[in-house]
């Protein structure tokens, strides 16, 4: 999760986020080189006393400043398109989880398990335990198995919301009357935090998301326990 004075992105816990971080560094390096070149040219223009008042055309320069930007745009576009197609790949997901946005909480439904659904509200500050995070904890964490492809179906019951978990590289709009889907996976166990990322009303800042990734066998035990409790 994010921490004070953080300069970079959150640590990646999914292959998609690792690709996004690599693309971010790639694009940032290109921008740095372009900025350095522009500053260098500006400094030359400010310090040189030579002028070219008689130059009417310079086809070589025009060709360079047309072709070079096109090459740079291609260098940025190709890895971006690759990641875009990766996010749309759905190969036999282990389970399907449906997230429904409300003002101002989330509802979750495990489509592969009978009667396994719950609401997830923010934990009030006065109920927080030592070590828990203000405005990020919920009363019911969303538990998922690690190292498994999970299909998320995201919608809304009232207004526009957005389901986002930065460390997984996942962000999808929750739109009333429409289902959006994304694929997510975690390569390690742990707690991962997110929030609603679409302004949805006065309590928009109080819609946290907490995903708890655990081992396969522990997840099956957890799902069986909730099913027994719901009977």
UniProtKB/Swiss-Prot annotation:
All ranges on the Mitochondrial matrix side of the membrane: 46-59
Transmembrane segments: 15-45, 60-87
Cellular component GO terms, alphabetical: mitochondrial inner membrane; respiratory chain complex IV
Single GO MF descriptor: copper ion binding
Ligand binding (Mg(2+)): 198
Keywords: Copper, Electron transport, Magnesium, Membrane, Metal-binding, Mitochondrion, Mitochondrion inner membrane, Respiratory chain, Translocase, Transmembrane, Transmembrane helix, Transport
Domain of life: Eukaryota
Cofactor(s) needed by this chain: Cu cation
Amino acids binding Cu cation A1: 161, 196, 200, 207
Known partners and oligomeric status: Component of the cytochrome c oxidase (complex IV, CIV), a multisubunit enzyme composed of 14 subunits. The complex is composed of a catalytic core of 3 subunits MT-CO1, MT-CO2 and MT-CO3, encoded in the mitochondrial DNA, and 11 supernumerary subunits COX4I, COX5A, COX5B, COX6A, COX6B, COX6C, COX7A, COX7B, COX7C, COX8 and NDUFA4, which are encoded in the nuclear genome.
Protein's name in the database: Cytochrome c oxidase subunit 2
Organism this protein belongs to: Alouatta palliata
Lineage of the species this protein comes from: Eukaryota, Metazoa, Chordata, Craniata, Vertebrata
